[in-house]
Amino acid sequence: KTALITGATSGIGKATAIVLAKNNFNVVLCGRREDRLQELYEELSQYTSVHTLTFDVRNKEAVAAQIGSLPEAFATIDVLINNAGNAHGLDPIQNGSEDDWDAMIDINVKGLLYVSKAIIPQMVARKSGHIINIGSTAAKEVYPNGNVYCASKHAVDALNQGMRMDLNPFGIRVGAIHPGMVATEFSEVRFKGDTERAANVYKGFTPLQPEDIADIIHFVITRPY
């Protein structure tokens, strides 16, 4: 089977790519950072067939063109893992940055839609496929100053439920995984490179690791139909 993973260059996406490659999935790695994609390509090619696509999920033309360019050996996507996502800032709504809001909505919501739109038609035609949308506990509960990020993840949860309703008649499985605190670049990106502030997010407890979520994803997509 072939799995396409967005946001594959770090964190949960990278960990998932490694787990799937070691468990006989062919993998299509998608991300913005070509150097990191190449490193991961070289690492995983010893286990399985690997293809990389470089694009930003916010760019719908690039998404369509890149996914449309997949060679025949990778063109049939059995599993789509919508993992690309981000948080920017942690400010009360009155102090929020419009640029931060745009980034979160464009990546977390619209980017997920653009990638899904490029792949779902082939799943419908085959009447098979599995989509995993990576949400967050923020999809279930809003926390102080999380306003727009939490809204974007609530949207992912709603889209996940809507996709399931729409695609179930075609034999396509759709599910979401909503991680809590996971030790990734997430907080460093949120705080724009402030590593000290990012480290404080995990102070006083042991966060999950990306591999923990990757194991859950692998478990879910390998359950018998």
Q: For each of these PLM feature ranges, what is it?
A:
Residues 9-10:
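Conserved glycine-rich cofactor-binding loop
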Residues 25-39:
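Conserved glycine-rich Rossmann-like NAD(P)H-binding loop of the short-chain dehydrogenase/reductase
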Residues 54-65, 98:
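The beta1-alpha1 cofactor-binding region of Rossmann-like NAD(H)/NADP(H)-dependent oxidoreductases
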Residues 91-93, 100-103:
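Substrate-binding pocket helix/loop in short-chain dehydrogenase/reductase
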Residues 116, 152:
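Active-site helix of classical SDR
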Residues 136:
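Residue(s) in the substrate-gating loop at a strand-loop-helix junction
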Residues 172, 176-177, 196-225:
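C-terminal helical subdomain
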